[in-house]
Amino acid sequence: MDVQFLGGAREVGRSAILVNDSLLLDYGMLAGTPPRFPVADPDPDAVVVSHGHLDHAGAVPALLSGETRPPIHWTPPTRELAVTLAEDTLKLHGGSLQCPFTENDLRRVRGVSEAHGYGEPFPAAGHEITFYNAGHIPGSAHVL
């Protein structure tokens, strides 16, 4: 198994872990002025988001700025919080170098979103994934 940390190592924020060059676990941002984003632009086959905080989901729409449209797997509350915070990021930084995604990218998120409940296994990029309640915030998940 190949694991690459694209952010979130030795820092709090911009969590992004690429597994076997195909499964991306989280794709967050480090809030600040200017905000910082993961160090690479991966091209995953699927994305799994653990919870909706900016440091874990804040850069997810940027994954949809190119031609590929990987499915984004998350719980329903995580999806709603992540989309709401992305809308807020666009209001604050949209159209500037401080925001790596556009309104079109955010619209695409809804088109590739796949919501899952706890304890329901699902396939993602050749892996079987199951969410378990992490108890951090509503919808947060341990990802196994």
Regions from the language model: what does each represent?
Residues 1-4, 18, 120-144:
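Catalytic core of the metallo-beta-lactamase
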Residues 9-14, 18-70, 74-113:
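Pre-active-site segment of Zn-dependent metallo-hydrolases
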Residues 106-126:
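Alpha-helix-centered segments that form part of catalytic cores
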